[in-house]
């Protein structure tokens, strides 16, 4: 059986990955803080010496308020690279790491994997730096390596500051939900699709950068109204088109994901939101 180490298995995306991994024939080994602190080099080294996986799927990173500028991004970049080296030293063959669309220099056109890079936060800088050093290391050490760039995310048990959770929670409490920048269009992808896409990528021989996205955008206004309509709370939703220096469109080109990796998203917005709401109502 194919043995894979999965990091971030309690996170928004990682927690959805175990089932598709098992369905694809992987034996899944969780690298959790309880068993192995990713920031502790000795523990990481011993973990990979013990398990000797052929595959590595890496989601673990800092999230939530303050994550974009937190100094922990530096530590996680270093720790993730050390983990890849430990993986390689113990017989590892293929690794897939998660990146972010915030590595890109945004434009109104759908972003392709070869689009210019211009990270605007420490988080994005360190993600991009990690990809560069891991890609170079993998090439020199005969490791099959891919970098999946995640765009916008929605799913189950989100942190309260995220847009989807904010809207749902406010409306369920019969309180006003305000969306200030309804004109912005974003490429949102359901966590079950994201995790399944990463598993498909891991189980392929595709190397390099791959956008993990729907390839389509939805305005924040349309997205919020869809949630409100499903909850029959349209009267509690307030939409503004406030001035902002944020890019109008952040949409990915998913041609490599769909044509080369062979992954097609399973869920549309309506079906995915129904799944999310069904666990709350």
Residue ranges and their predicted role:
Residues 3-23:
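N-terminal Rossmann NAD(P)H-binding glycine-rich loop of SDR-like oxidoreductase domains
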Residues 7, 31, 56-59, 95-101, ...:
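SDR active-site strand-loop-helix element
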Residues 81-122:
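Conserved Rossmann-fold NAD(P)-dependent oxidoreductase catalytic core, especially the SDR/UDP-sugar
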